[in-house]
Swiss-Prot record:
Source superkingdom: Bacteria
Keywords: Ribonucleoprotein, Ribosomal protein, RNA-binding, rRNA-binding
Gene assigned in the entry: rpsC
Gene Ontology MF term list: mRNA binding; rRNA binding; structural constituent of ribosome
Organism whose genome encodes this protein: Geobacillus sp. (strain WCH70)
PANTHER family, A to Z: 30S/40S RIBOSOMAL PROTEIN S3 (PTHR11760), SMALL RIBOSOMAL SUBUNIT PROTEIN US3C (PTHR11760:SF19)
UniProt-recorded name of the protein: Small ribosomal subunit protein uS3
Length: 218
């Protein structure tokens, strides 16, 4: 059986960048665990704020965190109170100076993480898995996606035997490295156990820009 590599990991260094950007020698393991703690804390604290991606950069004793969210108002809070409280909590957690940037996601229906989380929440609210997937596909295509594929796995509809069902529309060229494909997973906790949700969204091609050389401007 052909297995599918993670489309995001496959494109790192080509059209995607790392979510953590820092270099360390001795303290690598400690900083990696710190990154995991930061991500876990932010996702838990902002679980209703539609957070898609958390980027972490480090320089000396400073941590720069960029939070990509579809609900920036909820993250920032009234007069910046929420983001300031989050910054203080992360400073206490890491023991370093923390700076937080908030980036708004303009089209949440084209973000695989948010689409997967949305399908998972609907499944927890006992919405039919077929209906949840088809609605997500329609919204993504209306938002301008070139293609989308969704898959839900587990005891669908409370069946005794677990299975997977997937739906797709448009094209999702997983082998084309210049194709901007967003991929994410989510879990739904239902009365029959966990259901796994996977989403692939093709947002069009990204052509790598050629760097001009100083000689002749080629």
């Amino acid at each position: 059986m052909g297995q599918k590599v993670n489309p995001v990991g496959l494109r790192i260094g080509i059209i995607r960048d790392w979510d953590s950007r820092w270099y360390a020698e001795k303290d690598y393991a400690d900083l990696l665990h710190e990154d995991l703690k930061i991500r876990e804390y932010i996702n838990k604290r902002l679980q209703d704020a539609a957070v898609s991606r958390i980027e972490i950069e480090r320089a000396a004793n400073r941590v720069n965190i960029t939070i990509h969210t579809a609900k920036p108002g909820m993250v920032i809070g009234k007069g910046g109170s929420e983001v300031e409280a989050l910054r203080k909590a992360l400073t206490q957690l890491t023991g370093k100076r923390v700076h937080i940037n908030i980036v708004e996601i303009k089209k949440p229906d084209l973000d695989a993480k948010l689409v997967a989380e949305n399908i998972a929440r609907q499944l927890e609210n006992r919405v039919s898995f077929r209906r949840a997937q088809k609605q997500a596909i329609q919204r993504a295509m209306r938002a301008g996606a070139k293609g989308i594929k969704t898959m839900v796995s587990g005891r669908l509809g409370g069946a005794d035997i677990a299975r997977s069902e997937h739906y797709s529309e448009g094209t999702v060229p997983l082998h084309t490295l210049r194709a901007d494909i967003d991929y994410a997973t989510a879990e739904a906790d239902t009365t029959y156990g966990k259901l796994g949700v996977k989403v692939w969204i093709y947002r069009g091609e990204v052509l790598p820009t050629k760097k001009k050389t100083e000689e002749g401007g080629k």
